[in-house]
């Protein structure tokens, strides 16, 4: 079976009112862009060969204390392979807390890529190091949700 080029999409679903990561969509876009420019690929069976997007669905709640990554799901009639990621809630107020969030996201994505056997041009560690460098170029307020 040949390698299939895939892309990453990140979305968020929050289960509790007022409980969410207070970061701008710009953080998720940066992560998606950096991952997607690295020619992600995986081997898919003939039945799954139409899929070309890994959809990471991020959630948090006051009850989540550890990083948890769900089993990849293959919705019918969809291009997506959905992966649910539960991350511990972090109050993102400064660079340190933003980098902690990014490290947690890196751990979850690395686990998912390993499980799906996704290949990349660069290591996930190198990709996330470049993400952190980009994040630190801007003041923290650039990356936070505007009130």
Please report, for each region that a protein language model flagged, where it lies by residue.
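Sequence/structural signature of beta-propeller modules
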Residues: 1-145
């Amino acid at each position: 079976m040949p390698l299939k080029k895939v892309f990453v999409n990140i979305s968020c679903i929050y289960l509790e009112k007022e409980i969410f990561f207070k970061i701008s969509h710009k953080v998720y876009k940066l992560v998606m862009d950096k991952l997607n420019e690295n020619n992600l690929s995986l081997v898919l069976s003939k039945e799954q060969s139409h899929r070309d997007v890994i959809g990471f669905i991020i959630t948090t709640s006051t009850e989540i204390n550890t990083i948890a990554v769900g089993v990849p799901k293959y919705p019918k009639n969809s291009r997506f392979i959905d992966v649910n990621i539960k991350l511990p809630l972090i109050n993102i107020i400064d660079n340190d807390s933003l980098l902690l969030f990014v490290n947690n996201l890196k751990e979850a994505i690395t686990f998912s890529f390993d499980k799906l056997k996704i290949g990349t041009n660069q290591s996930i560690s190198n990709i996330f190091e470049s993400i952190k460098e980009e994040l630190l170029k801007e003041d923290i307020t650039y990356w936070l949700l505007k009130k």
